[in-house]
């Protein structure tokens, strides 16, 4: 995927809050404020003196005139994308290009589909296939968000020519330890846990559901839930996997002008001695 805007190098100075960094542009020496799109802690990356890449905002009146897009790893120079909006675009591009073996045959998709809390998952003959509905299942433990009547959005609703449906959430990951293992999340994420619970709810109701981690760097060999940072998310992911949610992860190649899907790596849960839990679609 081509990056549709030019970026310029700068030196990272500080991060006064989750959404703002201060940096010094290499070309002019000017100190600038930049929006940080990744709300993770990024402690191993945002170290004073690190080289970052920013682009100028289109709106000259914005409080942060620049946006942080990439960073060079302070230890090894590895370029890492910090654009948390990019994984959905990469997933859509991968679907179109036939990159994902688990989703071959899903030729159509809708993005950001609202999942009402009170409707069934599979459309009947009187309902539009673009509307998500949830079944009345007496043995089903509903997602806390859905049970409270909160409408939620699922990143993708995939469908085949014969009407088979798969629900997909993507998650952006950037944290990779020295051993090559990536971890998610980098900060506690109630929203991320809710998404996992909703996928679990869909899977228990009989729908196909998958969580796809997009690791925005090429050096990861696997990914695991970050139990130290968010044990609740780790527990939710384990429950979801046990109840039928499929887990996949893919690394990315990264330059300042292009980011692309590169290869699949295993998703490893933190129990069972890090047993490989990479899943494939079940045969019906």
List the predicted regions and their residue ranges.
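Short aromatic-glycine-enriched beta-strand elements
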Residues: 17-22
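A short acidic/basic microdomain associated with nuclease active sites
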Residues: 99-119, 139-142, 146-148
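Conserved catalytic cores of phosphodiester-cleaving nucleases, focusing on short active-site segments
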Residues: 10, 154-186, 199
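Terminal, basic amphipathic appendages of nucleotide-handling enzymes
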Residues: 46, 55-97, 101
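Short nucleic-acid-contacting surface segments enriched for D/E, G, S/T with interspersed K/R
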Residues: 40-53
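Short, low-complexity, charge-dense intrinsically disordered segments
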Residues: 120-149, 272-284
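Domain-level recognition of nuclease-like catalytic cores that cleave nucleotide substrates
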Residues: 216-271, 284
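Nucleic-acid nuclease catalytic cores
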Residues: 171, 180-193, 197-229, 251
């Amino acid at each position: 995927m081509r990056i549709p805007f030019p970026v310029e190098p700068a030196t990272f100075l500080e991060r006064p809050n989750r959404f703002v960094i201060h940096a010094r542009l290499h070309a002019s020496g000017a100190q600038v404020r930049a929006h940080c799109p990744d709300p993770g802690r990024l402690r191993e990356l945002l170290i004073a003196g690190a080289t970052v890449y920013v682009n100028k905002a289109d709106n000259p009146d914005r409080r942060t005139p620049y946006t942080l897009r990439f960073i060079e790893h302070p230890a090894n120079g590895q370029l890492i994308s910090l654009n948390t909006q990019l994984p959905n675009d990469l997933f859509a591009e991968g679907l179109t290009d036939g990159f994902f073996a688990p989703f071959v045959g899903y030729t159509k998709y809708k993005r950001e589909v609202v999942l009402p809390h009170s409707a069934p998952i599979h459309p009947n003959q009187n309902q539009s296939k673009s509307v998500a509905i949830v079944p009345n299942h007496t043995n089903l433990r509903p997602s806390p968000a859905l049970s409270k009547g909160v409408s939620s959005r699922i990143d993708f609703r995939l469908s085949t020519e014969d009407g088979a449906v798969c629900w997909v959430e993507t998650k952006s990951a950037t944290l990779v330890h020295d051993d090559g293992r990536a971890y998610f999340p980098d900060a506690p994420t109630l929203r991320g846990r809710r998404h996992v619970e909703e996928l679990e709810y869909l899977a228990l109701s009989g729908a196909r559901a998958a969580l796809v981690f997009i690791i925005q760097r090429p050096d990861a060999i696997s990914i695991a839930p970050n139990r130290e940072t968010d044990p609740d998310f780790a527990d939710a992911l384990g429950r979801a996997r046990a109840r039928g949610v499929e887990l996949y992860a893919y690394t990315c190649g990264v330059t300042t002008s292009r980011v692309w899907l590169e290869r699949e790596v295993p998703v490893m849960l933190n129990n069972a001695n890090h047993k490989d839990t990479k899943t494939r679609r079940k045969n019906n």
